[in-house]
Amino acid sequence: MERYAFRYRYDVTSTVYTFTDKPATVTHTHTASGKDSRTEAYTYSYDHADRLSKVEHTLGGAKVTLAAYAYDNLGRLQSKSLHGSDADRQAYAYNVRGWLTGISGTKFTQNLYYNTGNGPAKYNGSISSMTWKAGTASTVRGYKSTYDGLDRLLNATYGETAGISTNANRFSENVTGYDKNGNIKGLQRYGQTGASAYGLLDNLTFTLNGNQLSRVEDAVSTAAYGTNTAFVNGASAAGEYAYDVNGNLTKDLNKGITDIQYNLSLIHISEPTRP
């Protein structure tokens, strides 16, 4: 089965589908007045279980592999290779319950712990602790997590090395409480405050009207350092945030925005316009 879609400027897109209605080949032909046409194609391959196994791109007669996927006997993603190179391969590991426990590759490595690791043991699928390392970096970074009685995140305690104990709290985050609707009432964020100094960047208190945020106050005036970001407490008023009847944000005094107007786009999504 083949379908065609025509667009302005003489672009033609054709799609060939498999018998299970998945795209097998998507071909784009680009034409313009006075120019030679250009055709590119994406080819999708599937394994015996109809799972995506390879994505290839063809342009000017040259075909390259964009991605290749392999699955284990339980149908879980086992590995992913990008750009036809094992150098960009990532492997995935799971525990007996099917929960993801690790991602390993040359560009990024991550380990997730539930009832093992350095955080309080969790047996319901919530992450107790996690560690990661980017590329060839020697530093292993991680977080230990704690939860309240309703299994809502309370603390994400930062640390380095496999034990998540070195340089503790440099980038920790703490939720100070929840309201009866499950909205957070306060948030503390730590980060870099100087060339070699770390400390509390934000100590935020949230005021809500129902489930809509109406005010944010920050008890810390310390500015973030370098590329770190901290909340900018640009106002101190009862109604720092306002909304229209559809729930769209119409005012954000902390960013100096006093009025946001919306129109209705062709795809029925409200788009903000600055007056």
Model-derived regions: residue spans:
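Acidic/glycine-rich beta-solenoid
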Residues: M1-S270, R274
